[in-house]
Amino acid sequence: MAMSPAATVARRRLAAASQGSHEGGARTWKILSFVLALPGVGVCMANAYMKMQAHSHDPPEFVPYPHLRIRTKPWPWGDGNHSLFHNAHTNALPTGYEGPHH
């Protein structure tokens, strides 16, 4: 099966490229990092910042579902109602959220 002249030329160039040295590899990745990666990170940071500014920071309305926040016995630390990793800004108690949020 004969190859077309264009396919033969392309095959020779690709074969020659694989035989060549790796001198420009680090330079290529350095250019790609500065031209693509850093601006990409900047765009992602700007997107996250704009979404944070548009986001409502009020907690959702508390609904006391009976299957959540069940306390059959108190926790062995503190007042017994707060888990070890309790966060007053995000975690609700069985009676609702604690105090005002900022």
From Swiss-Prot:
Bilayer-crossing regions: 26-50
Keyword presence, Cytoplasm: no
CC terms in the record's Gene Ontology section: mitochondrial inner membrane
CDD domains per UniProt: Cyt_c_Oxidase_VIa
GO MF entry, a single one: enzyme regulator activity
Localization in the cell: Mitochondrion inner membrane
InterPro entries membership: Cyt_c_oxidase_su6a, Cyt_c_oxidase_su6a_CS, Cyt_c_oxidase_su6a_sf
Entry membrane topology: Single-pass membrane protein
The organism's place on the tree of life at top rank: Eukaryota
PROSITE patterns, sorted: COX6A (PS01329)
One Pfam family per UniProt: COX6A
Stretches in topological domain Mitochondrial matrix: 15-25
Gene Ontology terms: biological process: mitochondrial electron transport, cytochrome c to oxygen
Transit peptide, start-end: 1-14
Sequence ranges on the Mitochondrial intermembrane membrane side: 51-102
Assembly and binders: Component of the cytochrome c oxidase (complex IV, CIV), a multisubunit enzyme composed of 14 subunits. The complex is composed of a catalytic core of 3 subunits MT-CO1, MT-CO2 and MT-CO3, encoded in the mitochondrial DNA, and 11 supernumerary subunits COX4I, COX5A, COX5B, COX6A, COX6B, COX6C, COX7A, COX7B, COX7C, COX8 and NDUFA4, which are encoded in the nuclear genome.
Role played: Component of the cytochrome c oxidase, the last enzyme in the mitochondrial electron transport chain which drives oxidative phosphorylation. The respiratory chain contains 3 multisubunit complexes succinate dehydrogenase (complex II, CII), ubiquinol-cytochrome c oxidoreductase (cytochrome b-c1 complex, complex III, CIII) and cytochrome c oxidase (complex IV, CIV), that cooperate to transfer electrons derived from NADH and succinate to molecular oxygen, creating an electrochemical gradient over the inner membrane that drives transmembrane transport and the ATP synthase.
PANTHER family: CYTOCHROME C OXIDASE POLYPEPTIDE VIA (PTHR11504), CYTOCHROME C OXIDASE SUBUNIT (PTHR11504:SF8)
Name of the protein in its database record: Cytochrome c oxidase subunit 6A, mitochondrial
